[in-house]
């Protein structure tokens, strides 16, 4: 058959081509994501297509070719001149260049264009066939002889890109990466292909929207009326610091980026002002700081504060144009696979393994100027890790004496940001000074004592920074499990053997966690599925599995190892549902204390809710293995616990407040019952019980020695150890009581919803009133003790001095044992001597006569002034 003559089927296609194009245009309007696919039919010669190199001329063309990075890349370079453009395939072994004959051939055959239908059932093709078909379609798109068809298809593809440009920054990056990894052609950057990097830094002097004189601000970034990003909420702060970075895709520069600030409340968000940025005024490839003044035409405030942010506008590099092949089944399979791989790599990117620990000891401040602040504290930040020191009263040389541990990564050590903050009497926070430390410039395994001068403030901070390498953290598959290798396990066990107890005391042990699978998870998506992944937390150490998409019974089969710094830490395994650029949805959680781990045994754990108090939907299968040194663990027990990273402060919750009040009541009731038991012994309510108690008291006090105190505590431990079943039953009963309390709380909430808001207010008022009374009693007791020694009431102070003098003489001549015996005999025989006597505590009775500070003000006598004379007032009325 002569290949130069078109077939009958080809001639029929050639005649019906205008009708097919018009039909495809109508379909493209309905579904702009499906562009028209055109092919060119070429005469076959000794090569398969233009994109396949002529191996006979490869040696002659190689010196003139262009370099190529590797065979795995599918990027094809297209020159700017489309009329003479040749598509050059790249090879890892040689570089090729098109000859003039090939260019003439490509131009000559540009007129033979018609649509080609491929087999839709073929999902996979050979690499040569993929390269041939792709290069053929790429050539068609750049032939000048296509006339109107090529620009129309180009516009359709750009319309599709316009739709993609309105997505979030995370999806935008995934699509661009997908374009690079799939078969595509490079074009000049499109006018809408911009990326805007926003660094939301802080707010200053924002308006008050809460009754307490503060606000809970957060920021929204809007473009064309759509919210592209929402920041986190900073509670009770008029000078919030967000320090958040987001990358947004920009469709056109003829737009305004709206920045709106809101105050978060329980029912609605109050508006705190807005500002805008004209995108066309931004300079390309340059980071500029913008201080945006907030305004609200409906508000009476003149100054609503400012928002400080950095903006950087860049042209998106590598703006590729994707073309859908007619083989839709094959494209959808490859696209979904690529997206899944991209999401997987993104998830694994978050699981960076740290290489060591940065131990920072905040010693003190020197000559720190606090201004009108009454309290001071320090914030430390390294990447996403944050710590906050304890708050001290204002002092020129505050002594913090605190230690914080950061993770460091060898590839990005980063800068340690240190900020000194102050609080005034109204609890408004203000940044006093800052300083920075380049961690990469510090030597390893060495204590670095640094005195860091503060910027924008007088004074300095004295700190001790130590960098210690860490090798105990890893993520692997089940086939390369570290503890499965006997030699490696023996080596790890030897490292934590008893003879190495005094070597590297901070390295207590190592934990291996096998995250096997989960089952029957909660469906978080509208499709009835979830995209679950696991987050493992041990103290401040966090590792994460990859995401299993569209599955309620995922199998991760990953192995994680953690270095143990405290044997009393708790491993928290949380299952989340990945939700794109939004916060992940909660699917369940389980907490496992390290000391409760049974080595090497697979366990099935029932997932709990966020508060870890009730069962949630789903199960998770874990296998835990723990190796540690008991001596190191014991030494670590008597050192301060590791501080947790700074998290968002918890807001007032009626449920939590009520629960805590009930807990205090139960403890107080237990103490009160113990006191009542001793009082019943003194009151001789039961003759047998009081007699036994009196005899035990006499024998104990007469034979008492100091070593008997720890011995009595040991007997208490032994008593509880010999009755484990009863102890377990009591603990189970306590947990059931807590669950019952929660169920009662839920029922009360339902009832309160029926009763209305008045009952809720009364319930909260009752709780707050109880807390208020307890605090008042505690404060009054402490103030009365202080006022005894301050001679507030001279009679009581003189009486106390007389009693203390007599007590001193008695203790000097009479042993303490006899004094306690006399006191006990008096207590036990008081009811026998006087059956109608009222039991009392003499010390508390004495202190009740001393006024508190509030009573001192109430009892103080006001001086009579002439203007306040009652006679003068009567005369003025006359």
From Swiss-Prot:
Question: What are the alphabetically sorted keywords of the record?
Answer: Calcium, Developmental protein, Membrane, Metal-binding, Repeat, Transmembrane, Transmembrane helix
- In Swiss-Prot or TrEMBL terms, this protein is called Multiple C2 and transmembrane domain-containing protein 2
- How is the protein disposed in the membrane? Multi-pass membrane protein
Q: Which PANTHER family match?
A: C2 DOMAIN-CONTAINING PROTEIN, MULTIPLE C2 AND TRANSMEMBRANE DOMAIN-CONTAINING PROTEIN 2
Stretches of the chain forming a coiled coil according to its record: none
What gene name is given for the protein in this entry? Mctp2
Listed binding positions for Ca(2+) 3 are 525, 531, 577, 579
Q: What family does the entry list?
A: Belongs to the MCTP family.
């Amino acid at each position: 058959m002569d290949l130069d003559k078109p077939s009958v089927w080809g001639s029929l296609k050639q005649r019906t081509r205008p009708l097919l194009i018009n039909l495809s245009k109508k379909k493209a309007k309905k579904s702009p994501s499906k562009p028209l696919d055109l092919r060119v039919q070429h005469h076959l010669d000794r090569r398969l297509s233009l994109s396949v190199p002529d191996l006979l001329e490869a040696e002659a063309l190689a010196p003139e070719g262009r370099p190529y990075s590797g065979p795995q890349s599918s990027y094809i370079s297209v020159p700017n001149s489309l009329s003479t453009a040749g598509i050059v395939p790249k090879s890892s072994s040689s570089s090729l260049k098109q000859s003039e004959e090939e260019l003439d051939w490509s131009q000559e055959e540009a007129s033979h264009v018609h649509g080609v239908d491929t087999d839709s059932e073929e999902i996979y093709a050979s690499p040569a066939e993929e390269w041939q078909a792709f290069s053929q379609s790429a050539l068609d798109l750049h032939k000048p002889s296509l006339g109107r068809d090529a620009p129309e298809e180009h516009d359709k593809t750009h319309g599709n890109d316009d739709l993609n440009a309105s997505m979030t920054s995370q999806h935008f990056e995934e699509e661009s990466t997908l374009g690079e990894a799939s078969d595509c052609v490079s074009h000049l950057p499109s006018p809408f292909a911009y990326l805007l990097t926003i660094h939301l830094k802080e707010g200053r002097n924002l308006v008050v929207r809460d009754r307490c004189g503060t606000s809970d601000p957060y920021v929204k970034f809007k473009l064309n009326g759509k919210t592209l990003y929402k920041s986190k909420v900073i509670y009770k702060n008029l000078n919030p610091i967000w320090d958040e970075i987001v990358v947004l895709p920009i469709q056109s520069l003829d737009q305004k980026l709206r920045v709106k600030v809101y105050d978060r409340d329980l029912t609605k968000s109050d508006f705190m002002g807005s500002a805008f940025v004209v995108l066309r005024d931004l300079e390309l490839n340059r980071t500029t700081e913008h201080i945006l003044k907030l305004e609200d035409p409906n508000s009476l405030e003149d100054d609503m504060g400012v928002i400080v942010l950095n903006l950087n506008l860049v042209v998106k590099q590598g703006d590729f144009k994707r073309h859908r092949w007619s083989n839709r089944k094959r494209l959808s399979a490859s696209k979904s696979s690529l997206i899944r791989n991209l999401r997987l790599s993104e998830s694994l990117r978050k699981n960076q393994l740290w290489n060591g620990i940065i131990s920072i000891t905040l010693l003190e401040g020197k000559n720190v100027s606090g201004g009108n602040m009454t309290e001071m504290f320090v914030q430390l930040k390294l990447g996403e890790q944050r710590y906050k020191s304890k708050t001290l009263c204002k002092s020129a040389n505050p002594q913090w004496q605190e230690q914080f541990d950061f993770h460091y990564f060898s590839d990005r050590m980063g800068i340690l940001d240190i900020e000194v903050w102050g609080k005034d009497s109204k609890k408004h926070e203000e940044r006093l000074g800052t300083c920075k430390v380049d961690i990469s410039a510090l030597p390893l395994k060495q204590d670095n004592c640094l005195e860091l001068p503060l910027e924008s403030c007088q004074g300095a901070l004295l700190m001790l920074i130590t960098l210690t390498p860490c090798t105990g953290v890893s993520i692997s598959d089940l086939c390369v499990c570290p503890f499965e290798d006997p030699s490696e396990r023996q080596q790890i066990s030897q490292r934590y053997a008893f003879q190495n107890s005094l070597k590297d005391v901070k390295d207590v042990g190592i934990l291996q966690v096998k995250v096997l699978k989960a089952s029957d998870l909660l469906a978080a998506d509208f499709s009835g599925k979830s995209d679950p992944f696991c987050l493992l937390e041990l103290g401040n150490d966090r590792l994460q599995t990859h995401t299993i998409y569209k599955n309620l019974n995922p199998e991760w089969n990953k192995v994680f190892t953690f270095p143990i710094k405290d044997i009393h830490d708790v491993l928290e395994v949380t299952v989340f549902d990945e939700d794109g650029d939004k916060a992940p949805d909660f699917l369940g959680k389980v907490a496992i204390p390290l000391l409760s781990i049974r080595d090497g045994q697979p366990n099935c754990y029932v997932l709990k809710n966020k508060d870890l108090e009730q069962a949630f939907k789903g199960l998770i299968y874990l296998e835990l293995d723990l190796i540690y040194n008991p001596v190191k663990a014991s030494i670590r027990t008597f050192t301060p616990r590791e501080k947790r990273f700074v998290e968002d402060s918890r807001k007032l919750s009626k449920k939590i407040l009520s629960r805590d009040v009930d807990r205090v009541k139960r403890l107080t009731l237990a103490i009160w019952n113990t006191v009542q038991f001793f009082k019943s012994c003194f009151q001789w309510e039961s003759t047998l019980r009081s007699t036994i108690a009196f005899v035990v008291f006499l024998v104990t006090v007469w034979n008492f020695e100091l070593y008997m105190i720890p011995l009595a505590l040991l007997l208490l431990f032994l008593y509880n150890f010999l009755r484990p079943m009863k102890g377990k039953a009591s603990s189970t009963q306590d947990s059931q009581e807590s669950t019952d309390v929660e169920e009662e709380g839920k029922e009360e909430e339902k009832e309160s919803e029926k009763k209305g808001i008045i009952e809720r207010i009364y319930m909260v008022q009752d709780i707050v009133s109880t807390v208020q009374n307890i605090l008042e009693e505690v404060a009054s007791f402490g103030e009365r003790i202080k006022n005894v020694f301050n001679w507030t009431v001279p009679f009581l102070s003189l009486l106390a001095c007389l009693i203390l003098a007599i007590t001193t003489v008695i203790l000097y001549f009479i042993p303490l044992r006899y004094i306690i015996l006399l006191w006990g005999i008096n207590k036990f025989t008081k009811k026998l001597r006087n059956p109608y006597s009222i039991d009392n505590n003499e010390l508390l009775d004495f202190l009740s006569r001393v006024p508190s500070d509030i009573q001192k003000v109430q009892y103080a006598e006001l001086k009579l002034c002439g203007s306040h004379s009652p006679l003068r007032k009567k005369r003025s009325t006359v």
